[in-house]
């Protein structure tokens, strides 16, 4: 059977092991071809092909429910649920999402983007099933490091106290998240999986017996039984721990052996109460380069499938903001042993792997544990250290109480460096970083800044590291800088709460924040062509806002525009409007940013165009709002 003929996962039921293996081969081929062309998450999906096929071969997906953790594991799931023919549109505008979306397929039973959510959602479904007198199966597939997250452990703790609630948890144990897993739980699983001396003895016992007189090869069947018994002894320790938590335990089993997977899943489905199936997989399975470099091939930009090398850009690009951040912070840390970089399992993405390589004693990876990362930073700050929490904007949401309760209320000097702030592109709504201004600005003691370019990023890093009057946050975007020269030394901190005038004009005041400052300058040049001269201000800080600069300019010029790459509700424009209201500055104000809606997956440029945030669109709207009697429309 060709996988393109599979439009429903129940079609797997009648297939032989050989046919299922052929389906697995086709899934891997499509997966590799698509990611090589479009970019996206490569390693996670390759590791769960057989797991997905075997699980769905034992379920009735017209009734049964499956929740997937960190949805980039679910690419094989998407192909088996009627999306194979459109899989080439993965992460493209109007195409298939890179994560699970309930609105995309009836088989996406729960949306997933962030880690450690699957067991909680599945348990909720199981309890709803029982309350309504139904009897379908509910399965949570968790892995790629997500079991290190506290939320997953909270769900296991709850489920283990419900002995009559049928729930299956499948642990996809590939020893990895994005980077190698850290922490005691991961280390314990790895001991069971790889290094137990009893397991080693079982694996080598038969070879030793072959060298003894009278035995030779004659004991093979008996030896297999001995080996299996010893292996069961080897894994009984982790099984005992899981069963102490209230779960029946199966495993670990070979995550790439369809026969073993199907047999184990069928047994596990018969269990009353919660059950955990421990599946050992290889991240990147089937693509040798990804198996050897599981961190590098977790996610890829478009690449050459034969060589594994990224397809070069048609023209050289400036360094990414993450790369500039990593270089600058590492340089500062070399001269300041109190600087400690903290990441929550995102060392490569944030650039902190560079700090780890050069100054490992000044680097901490807490695993998928954002709440712990923030309070840990608070403890470090209490004792005079300079903690720098490098985290994606979307993931800091997960530690909001810790930011407020543990850091801001105590006014501790923790430096939050929020990567991927603003519009992130192909990862879509679950990963957009457009809410941080709003959710941080309302917290007392918090200072918030954003650089207009990569050189100003360097100065803001110096500012944050040297700021000791309380917590401070810096937001910066995904992707490359705009190409301004970088400084290798002589960095000076910025004055807190002070912006700068970049361009003078008497007809309009444009206040830009962060990445939108460059857009403001471009829009101002377009307006000049229509006889309109604008003053452009780089605000730098949204809190404290530079009212000493902004308010007199607003009163003198009389027309004000704000630009931000973030949500309008509670954002930079709202801060300006509040300042105008508080100081009785009665001037017309037009705010540009992200309205009260979700932003789907697309390229950042496509999303900005959809939101009316390109410089031509902004200039057009300014003309319509403030100068409609002066010039005809420029944009069709």
UniProtKB/Swiss-Prot annotation:
It comes from the Bacteria. Pathway: Metabolic intermediate biosynthesis; 1-deoxy-D-xylulose 5-phosphate biosynthesis; 1-deoxy-D-xylulose 5-phosphate from D-glyceraldehyde 3-phosphate and pyruvate: step 1/1. CDD domains: TPP_DXS, TPP_PYR_DXS_TK_like. Its cofactor is Mg(2+); thiamine diphosphate. Keywords: Isoprene biosynthesis, Magnesium, Metal-binding, Thiamine biosynthesis, Thiamine pyrophosphate, Transferase. The keyword Metal-binding applies. Its EC number is 2.2.1.7. It catalyses: D-glyceraldehyde 3-phosphate + pyruvate + H(+) = 1-deoxy-D-xylulose 5-phosphate + CO2. Binds 1 Mg(2+) ion per subunit. InterPro entries: Dxylulose-5-P_synthase, THDP-binding, Transketo_C/PFOR_II, Transketolase-like_Pyr-bd, Transketolase_BS, Transketolase_C, Transketolase_CS. GO terms for biological process: 1-deoxy-D-xylulose 5-phosphate biosynthetic process; isopentenyl diphosphate biosynthetic process, methylerythritol 4-phosphate pathway; terpenoid biosynthetic process; thiamine biosynthetic process. Catalyzes the acyloin condensation reaction between C atoms 2 and 3 of pyruvate and glyceraldehyde 3-phosphate to yield 1-deoxy-D-xylulose-5-phosphate (DXP). Homodimer. NCBIfam families: dxs, PRK05444.2-2. This is 1-deoxy-D-xylulose-5-phosphate synthase. The gene is dxs.
């Amino acid at each position: 059977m060709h996988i393109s003929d599979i439009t429903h996962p129940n079609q797997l039921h009648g297939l032989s092991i050989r046919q299922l293996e052929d389906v697995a081969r086709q899934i891997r081929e499509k997966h590799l071809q698509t990611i090589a062309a479009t970019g996206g998450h490569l390693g996670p999906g390759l590791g769960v092909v057989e797991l997905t096929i075997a699980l769905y071969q034992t379920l009735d997906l017209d009734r049964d429910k499956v929740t997937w953790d960190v949805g980039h594991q679910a690419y094989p799931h998407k192909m088996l649920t009627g999306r194979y023919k459109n899989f080439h549109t993965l992460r493209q505008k109007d195409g298939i999402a890179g994560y699970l979306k309930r609105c995309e397929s009836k088989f996406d039973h729960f949306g997933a983007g962030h880690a450690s959510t699957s067991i909680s959602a599945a348990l909720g479904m199981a309890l709803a099933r029982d309350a309504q007198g139904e009897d379908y199966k509910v399965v949570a597939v968790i892995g790629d490091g997500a079991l290190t997250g506290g939320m997953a452990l909270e769900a296991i703790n709850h489920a283990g106290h419900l002995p009559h609630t049928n729930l299956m948890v499948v642990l996809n144990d590939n020893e990895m998240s994005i980077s190698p897993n850290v922490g005691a739980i991961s280390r314990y699983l790895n001991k069971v999986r790889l290094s137990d001396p009893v397991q080693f003895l079982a694996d080598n016992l038969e070879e030793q017996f072959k060298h003894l007189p009278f035995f030779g090869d004659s004991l093979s069947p008996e030896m297999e039984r001995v080996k299996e018994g010893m292996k069961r002894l080897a894994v009984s320790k982790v099984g005992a721990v899981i069963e102490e938590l209230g779960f029946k335990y199966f495993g670990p089993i070979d995550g790439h052996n369809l026969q073993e997977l199907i047999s184990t899943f069928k047994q596990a489905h018969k269990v009353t109460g919660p059950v955990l199936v421990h599946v050992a997989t290889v991240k990147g399975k089937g693509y040798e380069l990804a198996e050897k470099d599981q961190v590098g091939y977790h996610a890829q930009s478009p690449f050459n499938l034969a060589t594994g090398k990224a397809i070069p850009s048609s023209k050289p690009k400036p360094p990414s903001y993450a790369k500039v951040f990593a270089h600058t912070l590492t340089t500062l840390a070399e001269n300041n042993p109190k600087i400690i970089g903290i990441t929550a399992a995102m060392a490569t993405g944030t650039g902190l792997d560079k700090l780890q390589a050069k100054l490992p004693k000044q680097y901490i990876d807490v695993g998928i544990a954002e709440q712990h990362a923030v309070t840990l930073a608070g403890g470090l700050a209490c004792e005079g250290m300079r903690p720098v929490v490098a985290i994606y904007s979307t993931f800091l949401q997960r530690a909001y109480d810790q930011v407020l309760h543990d850091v801001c209320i105590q006014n501790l000097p923790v430096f939050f460096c929020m990567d991927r702030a603003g519009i992130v592109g192909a990862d879509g709504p679950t990963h957009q970083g457009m809410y941080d201004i709003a959710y941080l600005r309302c917290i007392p003691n918090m200072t918030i800044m954003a650089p207009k370019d990569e050189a100003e990023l360097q100065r803001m890093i110096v500012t944050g590291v040297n700021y000791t009057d309380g917590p401070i946050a810096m937001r910066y975007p995904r992707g490359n800088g705009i190409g301004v020269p970088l400084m290798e030394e002589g960095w000076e901190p910025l004055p807190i709460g002070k912006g700068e005038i970049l361009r003078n004009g008497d007809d309009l005041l444009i206040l830009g924040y962060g990445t939108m400052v460059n857009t403001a300058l471009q829009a101002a040049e377009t307006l000049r062509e229509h006889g309109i001269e604008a003053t452009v201000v780089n605000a730098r800080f949204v809190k404290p806002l530079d009212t000493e600069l902004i308010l007199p300019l607003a009163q003198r010029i009389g027309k004000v525009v704000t630009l931000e790459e973030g949500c309008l509700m509670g954002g930079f424009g709202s801060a300006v409007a509040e300042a105008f209201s508080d100081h009785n500055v009665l001037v017309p104000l037009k705010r540009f940013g992200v309205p009260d809606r979700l932003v789907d997956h697309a390229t950042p440029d496509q999303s900005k165009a959809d939101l009316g945030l390109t410089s031509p669109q902004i200039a057009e709207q300014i003309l319509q709002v403030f100068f409609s009697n002066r010039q005809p429309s420029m944009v069709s």
